[in-house]
Amino acid sequence: MNPNQKIITIGSICMVIGIVSLMLQIGNIISIWVSHSIQTGNQHQAEPCNQSIITYENNTWVNQTYVNISNTNFLTEKAVASVTLAGNSSLCPISGWAVYSKDNGIRIGSKGDVFVIREPFISCSHLECRTFFLTQGALLNDKHSNGTVKDRSPYRTLMSCPVGEAPSPYNSRFESVAWSASACHDGTSWLTIGISGPDNGAVAVLKYNGIITDTIKSWRNNILRTQESECACVNGSCFTVMTDGPSNGQASYKIFKIEKGKVVKSVELNAPNYHYEECSCYPDAGEITCVCRDNWHGSNRPWVSFNQNLEYQIGYICSGVFGDNPRPNDGTGSCGPVSPNGAYGIKGFSFKYGNGVWIGRTKSTNSRSGFEMIWDPNGWTGTDSNFSVKQDIVAITDWSGYSGSFVQHPELTGLDCIRPCFWVELIRGRPKESTIWTSGSSISFCGVNSDTVGWSWPDGAELPFTIDK
């Protein structure tokens, strides 16, 4: 073989080896691509950040967690059997209130994508607590936030996000179209109640596990409305209170018993001279207690308690430590409506302990500012204004707003009692501040039988925003 033939032979061999190597590399790339496609083909669309999604399959919770690793989402599942939130325990004995959450939504919303909201509330399942809120179909610091002081519009929706997080399009879940709402968990699925429609014919849409299961039509054709806080569940049944009729006179009030999203029973209260709006309800020893707003003529709060058959009792908190706003200075109370400064009002709550009562209220007697918790050891039945504990929550120089109760069941906490908790809305913007919008953040506390501290946890946002200038 001459030198030229040797060169040609060696070159041919090298070319063959190179072609084979190239084909192997192409095959390797195709194999990796096919393997990746099979692995991720049945998963949800990639998200820009980590998130948890809970679905329901045959009364079993499936907790799906997406973990973002090198732009690839790996899905892990952990099935958790559903339970029944019994609600048969008593409220836990407490000596004060420990801070639980604060979302700082307005502060974050000056630069980030945060919903314009009002009427936030918290509700817990046996696995998690979520903040529910009524959006205005707009973001803070955006042109669509203009005019959001309005309570009822077709753009308002009930949404929810993990407790303590600022409500944004990236962490929030749509629940219902609503300008008045409630929600609660029976241990198997979430029940949501969303009211929308015209003032003279609104309809409440009930959803169970996200599916429409029932509706309730306005029966007085005068702004059907509900709690703006969580409904209460006992032994698989959930209970809510609705109002239909004048906000400044005698209206109609109904209790609804709901099972798996279907109304199974309702009772209209026989309550002349009473006014119930925006009730804050909680379970206690198998029964339900609701503390409400009298927007007609009471500066103390009306209550209704009932058993699972909807057999009920009604009254007003007797204490001379008045809980509504506006209200007179503390003095001599009444077990009926206290008339001075009794018109108008604000959503609030109290927790009954025997003859005693924890009263949550604004610090100001005539504006929605400040917040405090007061323990009146005889206030449920006694009319004096003596109290033994006062815990500061928000200073009188800072804005507050609505407040309401929620509970954490033993199935969540591992305690042998129902833990009482509350949230406070921190309203900012119109009508008290020079902005084009109205919105709020929230803070929450839970009752404990250990050390606590009073302080001020205000909203803290610096206004006006860029859109307001």
From Swiss-Prot:
Virion surface side: 28-469
Similarity section: Belongs to the glycosyl hydrolase 34 family.
Gene: NA
Catalytic activity from the UniProt record: Hydrolysis of alpha-(2->3)-, alpha-(2->6)-, alpha-(2->8)- glycosidic linkages of terminal sialic acid residues in oligosaccharides, glycoproteins, glycolipids, colominic acid and synthetic substrates
Residue ranges of the TM segments: 7-27
EC code: 3.2.1.18
Disulfide bonds: C92-C417, C124-C129, C184-C231, C233-C238, C279-C292, C281-C290, C318-C335, C421-C446
Region feature Head of neuraminidase, mapped onto this chain: 91-469
Organism, scientific name: Influenza A virus (strain A/Duck/Hong Kong/2986.1/2000 H5N1 genotype C)
Known partners and oligomeric status: Homotetramer.
Protein localization: Virion membrane; Host apical cell membrane
Hypervariable stalk region, as annotated region: 36-90
The protein's name: Neuraminidase
